[in-house]
């Protein structure tokens, strides 16, 4: 399925079912070449504005295993920063090294957002339940404007 097909389907669903959310898991799965990604991002940005829906796109990041990801690790970072209202990374520290770590912990890193400075949320999920909780809502150094 390509971006044009998804956009057309979304327009139909907005009219018939009141579509509110569009999620595409993996931008590379809908673009033929990495050079096409900025056009696709612009297309989904326009779709979000035209239909007044939230659009969530996931993409790959490149980084060394010993560092936390950043905006510079996005394959098409300039285009993603241009068209995205918010950019978040899910970082799982146990993948840093072979020494292990807690597989139930993850950090949600907000690297671009229209209202707040970058910050990190720590999340812990229980292996016995499907519940997860944010262990610290905001770091003390997070600032709102």
Segments from the language model and where they lie:
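C-terminal regions of RecA-like/P-loop NTPase motor modules
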Residues: 3-26, 46-51, 64-145
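Conserved ATPase-coupling elements of RecA-like P-loop NTPase cores
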Residues: 30-37
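C-terminal extracellular loops and terminal segments
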Residues: 38-42
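Conserved H-loop
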Residues: 53, 57-60
């Amino acid at each position: 399925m390509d971006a044009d097909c998804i956009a057309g389907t979304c327009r139909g669903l907005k009219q018939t079912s009141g579509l509110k959310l569009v999620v595409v898991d993996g931008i590379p799965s809908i673009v033929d070449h990495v050079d096409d990604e900025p056009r696709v991002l612009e297309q989904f940005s326009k779709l979000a504005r035209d239909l007044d829906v939230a659009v969530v796109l996931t993409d790959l990041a490149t980084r060394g295993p010993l560092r936390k990801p950043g905006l510079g690790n996005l394959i098409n970072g300039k285009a993603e920063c241009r068209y995205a209202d918010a950019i978040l990374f899910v970082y799982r520290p146990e993948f840093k090294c072979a020494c292990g770590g807690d597989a139930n912990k993850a950090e949600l890193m907000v690297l671009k957002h229209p209202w707040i400075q970058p910050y990190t949320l720590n999340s812990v999920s229980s292996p016995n339940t499907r519940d997860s909780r944010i262990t610290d809502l905001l770091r003390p150094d997070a600032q709102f404007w």
